[in-house]
Amino acid sequence: MKVYLDMCSIQRPLDSQDDVRVATEAQAVLGVLRLCESGQVTLVGSDALLFELEKNPHPIRKDYAAVVLSNAAAFAVTDQRVETRARQFELTGMKPLDALHLASAVEAEADFFCTCDDRLLKRARAVETGRTRVVSPLELVAEVSR
């Protein structure tokens, strides 16, 4: 099973845990990452994730995300197919980087694309993603725990 976590999902465990939703999503992401580390789930990395990682001005968050992405056993290169699909997603109102993440997941044939971003979740569920299911961290942990 291949899973693509966007950067907000990867970073969720570092967010303030004062909100119940954030704390629950953080635990869900950590559970999925443990499955990736054990080889039960394949984490998909991408050029888009590396680009976003490099832009992060917070050293702790940047280092944490780099460690997470070092465990990616699959990788989506931003090629012509990814760029074309991302442009199609942008036409639906997705932000360019969000569209690039989703396109990377779809072209890498990830089973799941996971985001904590409610706006992206709604927009991504409205487009054709083939075999890639768009899920929240809580939905993802329920799926991978089966």
Per-region residue spans from a language model:
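Acidic, PIN/NYN-like endoribonuclease modules and their adjacent C-terminal/linker elements
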Residues: 2, 11, 17-26, 91-92, ...
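Short, electropositive alpha-helical surface patch
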Residues: 55-70
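Alpha-helix capping/helix-boundary segments
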Residues: 9, 49, 82, 100-101, ...
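PIN/NYN-family metal-dependent endoribonuclease catalytic core
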Residues: 4-57, 74, 138-142
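Short beta-strand scaffold positions
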Residues: 77, 96-99, 115
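Acidic catalytic patch
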Residues: 47-52, 69-91
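A generic structural signal for well-ordered alpha-helical segments
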Residues: 36, 68-69, 127
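Short amphipathic alpha-helical segments and helix-helix/interface helices
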Residues: 29-34, 65-66, 102
